[in-house]
Every structure is written in structure tokens, then in C-alpha cells.
Amino acid sequence: MFIFDSAKKIKREFIPQEQGKVSLYVCGPTVYDDAHLGHAKSALVFDLLCRVLNANGYEVTYARNITDIDDKIINRAQEQNKTIKEVTDFYTDAYHKEMALLGISRPDIEPKATESLDAMYALVQKLLDNKHAYTTDDGDVYFDTSSDSKYLTLSNRVQDESEKLQRVQSSSQKRNPADFALWKSIHDESVTFGSPFGKGRPGWHLECSAMIEKHLSKPNAKFAVDIHGGGADLLFPHHENEAAQTRCATDHALAAYWMHNGFVNIDGEKMSKSLGNSFFLKDALKIYDGEVLRFYLLSTHYRSNFNFNEEDLATAKKRLDKIYRLKKRLFGVTYEDEKTDFKKELLETLSDDLNISASLALIEEMITRANETLDTAGKHKELKREALSNLSFIEKILGFGIKNPYEYFQFGVNEETKTEIAKLIEKRAEAKKSKDFAASDMLRDKILAYGVNLMDTPQGSFWEKI
């Protein structure tokens, strides 16, 4: 398996520290608002990575944090006249539900910042003891970037004072403009945490380093984790600062491999709530099936920036429809999992830095061949079983085609209408059983009046939205 390492800027063969086992940490959401498509893209990329690692026989321990300490959360709580916990619980729950609709599995470990304060205090103390941090007269604790000879080697940035002043909070008590807060002393606000350094709140960069040390780091390991992932916008300063903290507080580096997914853009602009052009995931899910969004957001290589537009989304749906139409042709077929050339080739392609474009091309070719075979030898059970086995592998490794094919084509029909159609189908089945064909035809017309197609199969009658 090969992964493009963002730190080394090359594609490298993936070799975990412990044979057969992989530790993965991904920066999760700050839960002060609804998830947008950028959050979805990142979560999907690393969900796919876990699936591919598992398919290659690795046992994966996947951690993705929840940032529930942040100034934005405090501001939102004040705006809504709610407690911090009420705000973070609400948006965390919403995030989980929306990710589930995209077919994203929950991580093995999901640490919260509020549950990791002791680990943060320990990390800050180590940095102070190692002379990589200092305390100001105001009670703040800063990381001393000048003490770390490897600072900026992850992001490969050049010392640029103007850039650092733009991206890193300024303070007259900092020794260097690039120094960043490990602990922010706060005396005039109620949302503070007691610590050995006084009342205050942890720095954002500190949270992730501490949670990795607490949950994933192992004694005598060269790296705290095998793979560290996140959005490309986190490379600097967040991941740069994380790496510096871990390197200077412990006897190991933070990650053996770094993976970063590209931005999601709308009309060519980087998606960001601060720019006001964010497309909330919950709004997209009202219009499109979650699996369609999954297919669309994964349809370009994870490192490429993604330009979200409805024309491409409609095209993605048509490509996913092909999977379900083949699955529908095979409905009722039973099979045993078996090795096929297609599965081998698909896994090899995805194992090459998650090469999704080539993978989707393979899937299209397989669907075309399967349909041609079914057209000419439709009763050949072995061919049907092979096609269904291939579809099952696509479902497992990519999360495409997970639904009943008839239910997939019912998206957009409300539950009340679905219930009414189900009742009519049941009545029609009874009429056909009693050979009341006039009633059966009348009931069929009533069903079709809902704007659906009705299909009679050996397994029963099914319908789909036109």
C-alpha cells in the first residue's frame, strides 16, 4: 500500500510501526455549528482509508477528536443563552447523525477536549521542564518556537514575520512572533478551567497532541501514531504546532505519515464559515440521499480541491444509479464470497494512495460487462453470483450500494406516501391471490398515480420513484 506523505511531499510505501496494526488520528470538528461539506469530505476520506486498510488485513485503531473547548463555542452559548455543554452536546449529536447518513462509521476512539485536561496539563509541564515553553507575567504559557530547530519542517514554510503575525495570535509578552499559546490565562470570564498554571483555557494545538499521547502513543515507539490526518488548511499552523509540541515534550515524533485532504469549494472559493459561503451538510441531505453525497464527495482524489456544484452532483448520482440498477437485476440471488480478478484489481487501485478515479473506472467497466453478460446469459447463476460478489466488495470497501435497490430509488418520497403505497401493494397482492384481476388493475393504477413505477418480481412487488 502506498500513501502520499504531506510532510515529505512524496508517495511512500506504507509500513506501520507494528506489523498488522495501524494507529490513525484525525482532527475532528469544533462543535459550535452544523457540519458543512468540508467536514463531510474529511470524514469520508478517512473512512475510506480505514476501509482500505482493513481490506489489506490491517487492524486499525482510529481516533477522531471532538473539540468542545473553544472561543467560538463560548460565543455561541452566549448567543443562544445556553450552557457550553448544551451547545456541544447538540452539535456533536447532529454531527454523528449526519455522518451516519453518509455511511461513515464512528471512530474507535472519540476523545473530547474537556475529558483530556489532565493529559494537557502533563504535556505543558513537560514542555516547561524541557525549556521549550515559558510563562508570561499575565499567566499565559507559550511554546518557544526558537527552541525547536525542526519548527516549520512539517509544512516546509520559510520564516516570514508578516505571515506569522497574520496566522498566530499576537501578544506583546511573546518572545517570538511565531510562539503560540499552550495555556491562555483568563480572569474575567466564567468559562475557565483550573490548572497548575492558573485558571484559563488550553490552546487549540495542545488539545490534539495531548489526546494522541493519552489514547494512541505507546512506550518506546518512534512515532506517536502511524498516520495523522486532516484538512489541508490544518497543515499550518495546527499540525505544525502539534508536531512541535510532541517532538519537544516526548522522546518520539508525532506521526510517521501525514495525510491531508483538499478543500471543498463553492464557485471556486474555499469553503469557510467566516467567508459566509458554507453549504451546510444538513441542507444537502434534505435534497440528496446521503449515499449520493458520499459518492460525489469521494469521486475526486482526496488531495485535490473539490469544486461543489449541482451539475457534477447529478452526474455522480447517475453513476451510483448504475450500481443499484445492476444490483436490482440481481435481486434475490444468493452468493458466497469468492475471490475475483475485479476485487483484486480494485483493492490494488485503492491501495495506491486511494486512487478513486481509476477505481470508479474499474467499477464502470465491471458493471458494463456484467450487464452485457446478463443480457446474453441471464439465467447463468454462476455469472450472477460473481457479479453480486463484486457488488458486495464495492459496498464493503467504498460504501456504495449498501441499500435495498428498490428503496434507494424511493428517495424523495415522504413516509406517509410510502405507507400508502405499501398498503395498496398489499391489497393488490390479495386481489391477485383471489384472482380478482379487475381490482388488481385498479389498485395498480392507484399506485402508479403516485408517480412511481411498479415492478412485479418473484420476490414480490416493488416500486421506485420516477
UniProtKB/Swiss-Prot annotation:
UniProt: ATP binding residues: K273
Cofactor note: Binds 1 zinc ion per subunit.
Signal peptide: none
Swiss-Prot/TrEMBL cofactor(s): Zn(2+)
Location in or out of the cell: Cytoplasm
One Pfam family matching this protein: tRNA-synt_1e
The name this protein goes by in its record: Cysteine--tRNA ligase
Catalytic activity: tRNA(Cys) + L-cysteine + ATP = L-cysteinyl-tRNA(Cys) + AMP + diphosphate
Molecular function as annotated in GO: ATP binding; cysteine-tRNA ligase activity; zinc ion binding
EC number: 6.1.1.16
Organism: Sulfurimonas denitrificans (strain ATCC 33889 / DSM 1251)
Motif 'HIGH' region: chain residues: 29-39
Keywords carried by this UniProt record: Aminoacyl-tRNA synthetase, ATP-binding, Cytoplasm, Ligase, Metal-binding, Nucleotide-binding, Protein biosynthesis, Zinc
A GO-annotated cellular component: cytosol
Gene Ontology BP terms: cysteinyl-tRNA aminoacylation
Motif ('KMSKS' region): 270-274
Family: Belongs to the class-I aminoacyl-tRNA synthetase family.
Enzyme class: ligase
Subunit organization: Monomer.
Chain sites annotated for binding Zn(2+): C27, C208, H238, E242
NCBIfam families: cysS
